[in-house]
Curated annotation (Swiss-Prot):
Record's keyword terms, sorted: NAD, NADP, Oxidoreductase, Tricarboxylic acid cycle
A GO molecular function held by the record: L-lactate dehydrogenase activity
Entry keyword Lyase: no
Described purpose of this protein according to its UniProt entry: Catalyzes the reversible oxidation of malate to oxaloacetate.
Gene this protein is translated from: mdh
One Pfam family in the UniProt entry: Ldh_1_N
Annotated protein name in UniProt: Malate dehydrogenase
Annotated organism of origin: Methanococcus maripaludis (strain DSM 14266 / JCM 13030 / NBRC 101832 / S2 / LL)
Family under the similarity heading: Belongs to the LDH/MDH superfamily.
Family matches, as CDD domains: LDH-like_MDH_nadp
Highest taxon listed in the record's lineage: Archaea
Record's keyword annotation contains Acetylation: no
Residues binding substrate: 86, 92, 123, 154
GO terms for biological process, alphabetical: lactate metabolic process; tricarboxylic acid cycle
C-alpha cells in the first residue's frame, strides 16, 4: 500500500509516519509538507530508517520527502493532518475559515494528479471532510474523516472502567459532530452483549459527567501538553489497516450523508457508523436510536450542516 501524509512535519504526522512504517502492508510513504519544512522531513526520514533498523525490521520500505503533491498520484490513501492548530483564544469560526482555505488548496491539487482516498484529520474535522469532498469531486466513499472515532473510544474506556470489565467486552459509539453536540448512543451500548441499561451498576453510571469530560478532552490535552498526537495517530493506523486488509469493520467516522437517517434533510459530513473496507466507506450503517438520541443527532446534524454551507464559498 502507498500512503501519503500531508503535514508530515507536524506532531501527528511525525508519529503517524513511524507507526505506518511498522506496518507490513505499507510499501511506500510520501512525507509531504511546505517547502520550508523539507529539511525537517529529510531528518524525519533518516530517523525512521534508524527506528526500523533498531527494531530489527526490514528497511525495504520507500520513504519519500516532498513539497510537491504530484507524489500523491499513486497513493491508495492520502492523509491530511495539515492545518492551523487551535489556540486557546481562537474561535471555532476562525479555525474553520483558516483551515478551509488550506484544505481547499491541497485537495484541488491532489485531485489533479490522480484518484486516491482522502482521510481527513484536520479540525474541525467534519467541516474539513466536507470541504475536501466538494473540492475534490471524488465519490463520497473516497473522502472521510476521523470524526467521532476517538470520542467513541474515550466513551468505551469510561464504560469499561465504570462496569469494571475488559475494554474488548464493551460495544458503544458516539455519533454526530466531533464537538459539543456529539451524541453517545446509550441504547446501542452493551457490555458482553448485554445492554448497559440492564446492568445493576447502570443506576450509578455518571453519564452527564463522562460526556462533559469527553467533550472537553481534546482541549484539556492542548492545555496540558499543547496538543495530542499519539491517540489520533494510533487510530489512523488502525483505520488504514482496515482498508488495506478489507476488514469490513464497523467504525464511527465522518462521512457524507443526506437521507440515510430518518428526519434529516440536506447533506453534510458527520460522524456515523460505517463499514470500512478496501473501497473506503462501503456502507453507512442505519442504527436504531431512541427518540432523545435521534433528536440530539438531528440538532447536531443541523449545526454541522449550517457550518458546511458557510465554507462552500471559501
Amino acid at each position: 500500500m502507498d500512503v501519503s501524509i500531508i503535514g508530515a512535519s507536524g506532531k501527528i504526522g511525525s508519529v503517524l509516519s513511524l507507526l505506518l512504517a511498522k506496518e507490513s502492508h505499507i510499501k511506500n510513504i510520501n512525507l509531504i509538507a511546505r517547502s520550508s519544512s523539507i529539511n525537517k522531513l529529510k531528518g524525519l526520514k533518516m530517523d525512521l530508517y534508524d527506528a526500523m533498523a533498531a527494531a530489527g525490521q526490514d528497511t525495504d520500505i520507500d520513504i519519500c520527502c516532498d513539497d510537491d503533491l504530484s507524489c500523491t498520484a499513486n497513493s491508495d490513501i492520502t492523509i491530511i493532518t495539515a492545518g492551523m492548530a487551535r489556540t486557546g483564544e481562537m474561535s471555532r469560526i476562525d479555525l474553520m475559515k483558516g483551515n478551509a482555505k488550506i484544505v481547499k488548496n491541497y485537495v484541488k491539487n491532489i485531485a489533479n494528479f490522480g484518484d486516491t482516498k482522502i482521510f481527513m484529520i484536520s479540525n474541525p474535522v467534519d467541516l474539513m471532510t466536507y470541504k475536501a469532498l466538494i473540492e475534490s469531486g471524488y465519490e463520497k466513499n473516497q473522502v472521510f474523516g476521523l470524526g467521532t472515532h476517538l470520542d467513541s473510544m474515550r466513551f468505551k474506556v469510561a464504560v469499561a472502567k465504570h462496569f469494571e470489565v475488559h475494554l474488548d467486552d464493551v460495544r458503544t459509539r458516539i455519533v454526530g459532530e466531533h464537538g459539543d453536540s456529539m451524541v453517545p448512543v446509550i441504547s446501542a451500548t452493551a457490555v458482553g452483549g448485554i445492554p448497559i441499561k440492564r446492568l445493576p451498576k447502570y443506576e450509578d453510571f455518571p453519564y452527564e459527567k463522562i460526556l462533559e469530560r469527553i467533550k472537553g478532552y481534546g482541549q484539556e490535552i492542548i492545555n496540558l501538553k499543547n496538543g495530542s498526537e499519539y491517540g489520533p495517530a494510533s487510530a489512523i493506523v488502525n483505520i488504514v489497516r482496515c482498508i488495506a486488509h478489507d476488514e469490513k469493520r464497523l467504525l464511527t467516522l465522518s462521512t457524507y450523508i443526506e437521507d440515510e437517517i430518518e428526519g434529516i434533510e440536506g447533506g453534510c459530513c458527520i460522524g456515523v457508523p460505517v463499514k470500512v473496507g478496501k473501497n473506503g466507506i462501503e456502507e453507512v450503517i442505519h442504527i436504531k436510536m431512541e427518540d432523545d438520541e435521534i433528536e440530539g443527532f438531528k440538532k447536531s446534524f443541523e449545526l454541522v450542516k449550517g457550518y458546511c454551507r458557510q465554507i462552500e464559498s471559501i
